[in-house]
């Protein structure tokens, strides 16, 4: 395997790279777009480094809030259990519309919606769109309790916040999540 280093470049060229001409100039020509490639690769590697570490820049405990947990360098050595109920209120007449999660979600989806904040928010947005197709403007409130690693369930979401009106903050802490302590 190391014998390649003892042959002349012309010999290696004639054996392995017959169709490619041998480059014999003493100077190496730098491509015109080398700086663009360097910047692009630098940004790519920066993203690959920062994305898994973003949970250090988001306030509160990532184990509790789940913010910044996915695609991070953390081990999933925890289990979450919880319950959640969604209350939909029609803005025109303040009528409460009951939501049965079984009508909308599978068992696995229901587990995710009741324990993970991004799923709760997405389901609230889905319900908002569902009622918008029926020409109803609604507010959606969630009462959720979550327990981690077999601990007792604790309040997880501020039930006075309308999740239908909340924006999703990808790299920031969501105000509607209650603190871990």
Which residues fall in each region the model found?
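Hydrophobic cores of alpha-helical transmembrane segments in multi-pass inner/ER membrane proteins
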Residues: 1-15
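Extracytosolic and intramembrane catalytic regions of membrane-associated proteins
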Residues: 66-181
């Amino acid at each position: 395997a190391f014998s390649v280093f003892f042959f002349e470049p012309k010999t290696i060229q004639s054996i392995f790279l017959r169709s490619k001409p041998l480059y014999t100039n003493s100077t190496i020509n730098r491509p015109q777009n080398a700086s663009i490639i360097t910047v692009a690769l630098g940004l790519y590697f920066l993203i690959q480094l920062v994305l898994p570490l973003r949970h250090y820049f988001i306030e509160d405990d990532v184990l509790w809030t789940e913010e910044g947990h996915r695609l991070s360098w953390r081990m999933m050595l925890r289990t979450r259990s919880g319950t959640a109920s969604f209350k939909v209120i029609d803005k025109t007449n303040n009528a409460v519309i009951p939501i049965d999660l079984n009508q909308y979600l599978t068992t696995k989806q229901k587990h995710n919606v009741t324990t993970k904040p991004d799923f709760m928010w997405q389901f609230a947005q889905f319900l908002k769109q569902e009622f918008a197709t029926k020409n109803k403007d609604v507010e959606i409130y969630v009462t959720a309790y979550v327990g981690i690693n077999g601990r007792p369930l604790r309040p997880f979401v501020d039930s006075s916040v309308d999740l239908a009106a909340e924006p999703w903050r990808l790299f920031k802490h969501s105000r509607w999540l209650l603190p871990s302590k």
